Amino acid sequence: MTTKRAYKLQEFVAHSAAVNCLKIGRKSSRVLVTGGEDHKVNLWAIGKPNAILSLYGHSSGIDSVTFDASEVLVAAGAASGTIKLWDLEEAKIVRTLTGHRSNCISVDFHPFGEFFASGSLDTNLKIWDIRKKGCIHTYKGHTRGVNVLRFTPDGRWVVSGGEDNIVKVWDLTAGKLLTEFKSHEGQIQSLDFHPHEFLLATGSADRTVKFWDLETFELIGSGGPETAGVRCLSFNPDGKTVLCGLQESLKIFSWEPIRCHDGVDVGWSRLSDMNVHEGKLLGCSYNQSCVGVWVVDLSRTEPCMAGDTAQSNGHPEKRSCSGRDPVVLNDNNSKTVLGKLSVSQNVDPLLKETKSLGRLSVSQNSDPSTKETKSIGRSSTSQNSESSMKESKPLGRLSVSQNSDVSKESRTFSSTGSLPGTPHRVSSTNVSKATSGVSTAVSNAATSRRNFTKANPKANPVNKAADFAPVIVPRADPRIEQATESRAELDIIARTMPYSLQAADSRRSPSSRNNPDLPDASVLEMSESQPVEPNNIPDGGTLPGGKVGMRGATERSINDFRYKRYGRSNSRSRMGSPPRNHDENYDLVSHRSNRDPSPTESQKGGRFQSLVINRERRGRFSNFEGPVSNFSSGNMPAPNIRPSNMFKQRGNHMPVEQGIDSPSEENIVEDIMGKHNQFVSSMQSRLAKLQVVRRYWERNDVKNSIGSIEKMADNAVTADVLGIITERNEILTLDNCTSLLPLLTALLGSGMDQHLSVSLDLLLKLVRLYGSPIYSSLSAPASVGVDIEAEQRIERYSRCFVELEKVKACLPSLARRGGLVAKSVLELNLAFQEVSS
């Protein structure tokens, strides 16, 4: 290698006395704040040798510092227990808070809302309201100092780690301790949350890193012991690995399974903070009065480097560890979370779910002569197929038990969260060749209460293609069922709040990839609600055992599809609706039985979903059973989006003689499914954001409601809320007008007519209310004497004027759109002429 994997970016003298603490700004990763024994807080631009700003005010040494989410405020806790907040834009102290009886050694800002938490050597954890200028809650429970604390990304819990070796989880809403983790044997020095899942990682002086499930509050596993204590840790933004900073090295762990992939020797001594930015790890350490900034190139470390090698060798499914996900779910850049949830499948419609040690375990028996074992972290699935090959693969935490000799089904809707609907793998010994006109295949995946795991490229089962054949599955009247299912699912979507939902990515079997004689469709699956029965078997009579050729059977099955139009899509974007007769054209929809719940696969991703809501809903939904799907609390049912076997995946080749009318049909199907998946995900993300706004709204805190909308930068959410504000005249004050106008201006950049109409309607109302005083204030003479209220009012008028001028500049282009938008633009133009004349 010509380039070092780790190097020192800079080293500088930060204080005139010893440095006690430092923090990297998470928003930009370009700024650094340090606190020292010289009673000062210094602000630095990373890469520059001189301080941007020095903040004074404390009368004792600084023991903890941090930025808020926007890098506008800095909080610093001192040895006296006093906490001071500085506004960096004005370089002045905005709050001085007292309450701790000893050193304040940890601080953290709430992810949204004007709150922050502090931990002290007095063993107390305090929550502070910046607006009320005081402590709103004190949590007692630690027996020694609180070293580290973090708010959960949803802002509902705060997690603290202490010198007493205990990690405690506190519920901010209920104001009480939820649980505590006591497995560490040394003081807690660092903790971090998984970016997509309900997972907490903790690092300790006992030289181990431990992973905790925040839904079941169980220990998932432990990494180490290492050569030194874990001083800092941070999840890679892709969520696959956690980066652990030790005394003089960096260790890279995967959490499922837990193993150390790589170690990098770095020269940092007392590492204090680190952050991942654009594929680089930035670490900051201090020694006496000096601060060192270190960079580790993650693209040159395992497993990222292994992923790059795999891509060059023709395995594009390996993804880089740059921290950026190329797949976007919605306009807010929510990152796609593909499912790692896996299921085992077999011949008969039996589904037997058992819970062992708090997890589901699955065994399938098709032929006692062979076994296929699959394991992922905490669950294992054994499956006996006709081959004598034994495989070991990482899967999800769900496993299902199926037996080929019993024909019963046991479903559990209790707090264990197990769900029915495991698909069945159909062996060629039980299926004859397909007849034209009624052939289709449905790929379904089972889901559980814990279906929030992220995709792992290695977690794709390998199946011997020669052992499987297509299945012929009839269905009831699809027109009635589609309407019923669409209404039911939309109702469920409106009442639930996962952040991300999408189907697991099915990939081509390596066995079929290596054997040119085998087709790409390696396995065809069917729902448990549609077992192989005599009325499901085509006119071939008895089923030949193991003699059915996959190529011929698949060709016959696929040749039955003659898709001639794709324009119509229902709300579920399903695939594979069987024809009602041979002369009709159909969209791609999946079939289900009329009354049985369908197996589904869902995932939670994007940002951290509210765990409290998840727990509160267990009782409400635990026994829900509807025509669409059955699910436990917090799990969002969704259709299985991707056809896993009927059509080729990327990089696969379908036999030429199959005679598909259009060579791009499978791509069209994938596009349809992908768009539906994005729609569902964006709806759930929007719901989550609206609930954040609602919490402020219920407290009549309109100012912060508008402020939270501005931070979200989501046009859909903005339009939803502004549509309500338009009808509430009492909200349209001058103070709120200054906050609303930037949102309305930004909304004019949307390409949707609905958003434009909402913005133009509210703009028209504001111009009629405040247009005249805004424009007349510009020419008004200056007042004599000091009138603070008048000056504030004129300042608001000036800000409104700037935004209104931006709006006027946008109107000519909007007028060319025509329709209702052009009509609204004309009315707004007339209003501007009236108030400015």
UniProtKB/Swiss-Prot annotation:
Compositional bias (Basic and acidic residues): 553-563, 580-595
Broad class of the protein's primary localization: cytoplasm
Listed Polar residues bias regions: 376-387, 412-450
Gene Ontology biological-process entries: microtubule severing; regulation of unidimensional cell growth
Bias (Low complexity) ranges: 509-520
Residue ranges of WD repeats: 14-54, 57-96, 99-138, 141-182, 184-222, 225-265, 267-304
A single GO cellular-component term on record: microtubule cytoskeleton
Span of the annotated motif DWD box: 115-131
GO-annotated molecular function: microtubule binding
UniProt-annotated stretches for the region Disordered: 307-328, 358-462, 501-614
UniProt xrefs under Pfam families: Katanin_con80, WD40
Database matches in InterPro entries: G-protein_beta_WD-40_rep (IPR020472), Katanin_C-terminal (IPR028021), KTNB1 (IPR026962), WD40/YVTN_repeat-like_dom_sf (IPR015943), WD40_repeat_CS (IPR019775), WD40_repeat_dom_sf (IPR036322), WD40_rpt (IPR001680)
Outcome of gene disruption: The double mutant ktn80.3 ktn80.4 exhibits normal growth, but the quadruple mutant ktn80.1 ktn80.2 ktn80.3 ktn80.4 has a severe dwarf phenotype, with small and round dark-green rosette leaves as well as wide and short petioles, probably due to cell elongation defects, and associated with a complex cortical microtubule (MT) network with stable entanglements. Plants missing KTN80s have a disruption of KTN1 recruitment at MT crossover or branching nucleation sites, leading to an abolishment of MT severing.
Protein's cellular compartments: Cytoplasm, Cytoskeleton
Keywords: Cytoplasm, Cytoskeleton, Microtubule, Repeat, WD repeat
Tissues expressing the protein: Expressed in siliques, flowers, leaves, stems and roots.
Family listed: Belongs to the WD repeat KATNB1 family.
Record remark: domains: The DWD box is required for interaction with DDB1A.
Role this protein plays: May participate in a complex which severs microtubules in an ATP-dependent manner. This activity may promote rapid reorganization of cellular microtubule arrays. Confers precision to microtubule (MT) severing by specific targeting of KTN1 to MT cleavage sites such as crossover or branching nucleation sites. Together with other KTN80s, regulates cell elongation by modulating MT organization.
Quaternary context: Component of KTN80-KTN1 complexes composed of a hexamer of KTN1-KTN80 heterodimers that sense microtubule (MT) geometry to confer precise MT severing. Interacts directly with AAA1/KTN1, and weakly with KTN80.1 and KTN80.3.
Annotated protein name in UniProt: Katanin p80 WD40 repeat-containing subunit B1 homolog KTN80.4
Organism field: Arabidopsis thaliana
